[in-house]
Design a protein with these regions (language model features):
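Conserved interdomain hinge at the start of the Helicase C-terminal
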Residues: 1-75
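Short amphipathic alpha-helical interaction elements and helix-loop-helix interfaces
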Residues: 9, 21-28, 78-82, 104-108, ...
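Short interface patches used for recognition in eukaryotic signaling and trafficking proteins
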Residues: 1-4, 54-59, 84, 92, ...
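Arginine-glycine-biased low-complexity disordered regions
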Residues: 152-278
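Intrinsically disordered, low-complexity regions enriched in proline, serine, glycine
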Residues: 15-16, 27-31, 71-72, 84-86, ...
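Alpha-helical interaction elements in eukaryotic regulators
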Residues: 8-11, 15, 55, 65-68, ...
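Conserved RecA-like helicase motor core of SF1/SF2 enzymes
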Residues: 74-173
Length: 278
C-alpha cells in the first residue's frame, strides 16, 4: 500500500504521474482484434493465452461518482491509454462489453465507482488506485482486496487530499497499523502493513498539471465533463459520513508536520524505491 498526499485539484495530474512513473503502465496492451463494426458477431477473438499475457499491468481506478467515471476515463483516453469504464446506470450490454475488454486484456485500465464494481470478478489484477479516498474503512479493504490474489503481487495506491486525511487516520486506527509520514524516516518500511504517506515529486506533478490544463481547456467535451464532475463531487462530499472527531484533530497535526511535504519514499532513489520493493 502507498498513500500520496495530493490537493484535490491536482488529482488528474497525480493519476497520470503514478501511471507513468510508478506503475509504468504501457499505452498499448499488446492485444488486438479485428472488428466488423456492422456485425459484432463476426469479430475475431484473440486466444486466451495471448489475452492472459497482456494482463500484467491491469489496473482498476476507483472514483466517487458516475460523473468522475466519465471525466477521468476520457482524460486517460486523451492521454493515450486503453480504458474501460463502468458506472451504475450503464446498460447491461455496454457494461458487459467494457468488462470483457478489460478481462481479455484489450484495455488495461478500468475506471469504476464502488456501486458499479459490486459483483465484478477480475481474476488477474495488479493495481488498485483510489482516486477518491474512501469514507469507510471496510470499503477500503474491499477495494484493495481485489489485488494480489492467488499468491500474486499487487499494489494499492491512494490519493489523499487534506480534506480526506481524517478518513486515512480512521483507516490507520481500524487496521491498527503505524503511520509513517514523509521519506526522512530511518525505519525499515513495510508497504504491506505500514501506512506510508508522502507527496509526489513537484516537477512531475507540474508537468502533468500543465498537460491536463492544456488538453481539458482545448476540448469542450472534456471541459464540460470536468464541470459536471466537480459539481457531483460537491454533492458527494455533503452526503458522505464524517470521520471520527479525534481523526480530524490528528489529521490537522499531520498536515502541520514538516514531513507532510516530503516526497513519498517510492520516489526516492534509496532502498525504499519501488524497484527495490519488487
Amino acid at each position: 500500500m502507498a498513500f500520496f498526499s495530493v490537493k484535490q485539484q491536482d488529482k488528474e495530474a497525480a493519476l497520470l504521474t503514478v501511471l507513468r512513473n510508478v506503475i509504468k503502465l504501457p499505452m498499448e496492451t499488446g492485444v488486438r482484434f479485428e472488428r466488423d463494426e456492422e456485425n459484432p458477431k463476426k469479430r475475431k477473438r484473440v486466444s486466451k493465452d495471448v489475452a492472459g499475457a497482456a494482463t500484467e499491468h491491469q489496473t482498476i481506478v476507483f472514483v466517487s461518482t458516475k460523473h468522475h467515471v466519465e471525466y477521468i476515463s476520457n482524460v486517460l483516453i486523451k492521454a493515450g491509454y486503453q480504458v474501460s469504464y463502468i458506472y451504475g446506470s450503464l446498460d447491461q450490454v455496454a457494461r458487459k462489453t467494457q468488462i470483457d475488454r478489460f478481462r481479455q486484456g484489450y484495455t488495461n485500465l478500468l475506471v469504476v465507482t464502488d456501486v458499479a464494481a459490486r459483483g465484478i470478478d477480475i481474476p488477474v489484477l495488479e493495481n488498485v488506485i483510489n482516486y477518491d479516498f474512501v469514507d469507510n474503512s471496510k470499503v477500503f479493504i474491499h477495494r484493495v482486496g481485489r489485488t494480489a490474489r492467488a499468491g500474486k503481487k499487487g499494489w494499492a495506491f491512494s490519493f489523499v487530499s487534506p480534506e480526506e486525511l481524517p478518513y486515512l487516520v480512521d483507516l490507520q486506527l481500524f487496521l491498527n497499523r503505524k503511520m509513517i509520514v514523509g521519506s526522512s524516516t530511518e525505519q525499515e518500511l513495510d508497504y504491506t502493513s505500514d501506512v506510508v504517506i508522502g507527496a509526489l515529486p513537484m516537477s512531475q506533478l507540474e508537468l502533468d498539471n500543465e498537460w491536463t490544463k492544456i488538453h481539458v481547456l482545448d476540448d469542450t467535451n472534456l471541459e464540460a465533463l470536468r464541470g459536471v464532475s466537480l459539481n457531483g463531487y460537491k454533492l458527494y462530499c455533503k452526503s458522505r459520513p464524517s470521520a471520527a472527531v479525534e481523526s480530524y484533530k490528528r489529521a490537522k497535526e499531520i498536515v502541520d508536520m514538516d514531513e507532510y511535504a516530503e516526497i513519498h519514499p517510492l520516489f526516492s532513489k534509496d532502498k525504499h524505491s519501488l524497484e527495490a520493493m519488487g
